[in-house]
């Protein structure tokens, strides 16, 4: 079981590094965020299943709800930016520009 946790920690770390290194395009940032949320979901689900906590069994579902809201908001931002500027660069999201 420790190998599974190590793989999920590695997946989270790779997604975090991808988010930090490749942040020029909005789509790649959204994919890295989804990878982070997926690894957190699997880790939390495995932890709750192994510890037999009945009251905490709703926490992964709540995390999935937040991940779905984050994905919907991110995709709507992607559509807005690509319709306005024609590209999906993160630098176009600067609100201080006129």
Curated annotation (Swiss-Prot):
Its EC number is 7.1.1.2. Pfam families: Oxidored_q2. GO terms for biological process: ATP synthesis coupled electron transport. Keywords: Electron transport, Membrane, Mitochondrion, Mitochondrion inner membrane, NAD, Respiratory chain, Translocase, Transmembrane, Transmembrane helix, Transport, Ubiquinone. InterPro entries: NADH_UbQ_OxRdtase_chain4L/K, NUOK/Mnh_C1-like. One of its GO terms (cellular component) is respiratory chain complex I. GO terms for molecular function: NADH dehydrogenase (ubiquinone) activity. It catalyses: a ubiquinone + NADH + 5 H(+)(in) = a ubiquinol + NAD(+) + 4 H(+)(out). The keyword tRNA processing does not apply. Its main location: mitochondrion. Core subunit of respiratory chain NADH dehydrogenase (Complex I) which is composed of 45 different subunits. Core subunit of the mitochondrial membrane respiratory chain NADH dehydrogenase (Complex I) which catalyzes electron transfer from NADH through the respiratory chain, using ubiquinone as an electron acceptor. Part of the enzyme membrane arm which is embedded in the lipid bilayer and involved in proton translocation. This is NADH-ubiquinone oxidoreductase chain 4L. It comes from Pteropus dasymallus (Ryukyu flying fox). The gene is MT-ND4L.
């Amino acid at each position: 079981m420790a190998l599974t946790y190590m793989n999920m920690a590695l997946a989270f770390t790779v997604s975090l590094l991808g988010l930090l290194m490749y942040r020029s395009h909005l789509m790649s940032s959204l994919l890295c965020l989804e990878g982070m949320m997926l690894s957190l979901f699997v880790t939390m689900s495995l932890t709750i299943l192994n510890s037999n906590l009945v009251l905490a069994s709703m926490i992964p579902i709540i995390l999935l709800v937040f991940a779905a809201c984050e994905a919907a908001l991110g995709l709507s931002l992607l559509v807005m930016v690509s319709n306005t500027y024609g590209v999906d660069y993160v630098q176009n999201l600067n609100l201080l520009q006129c």
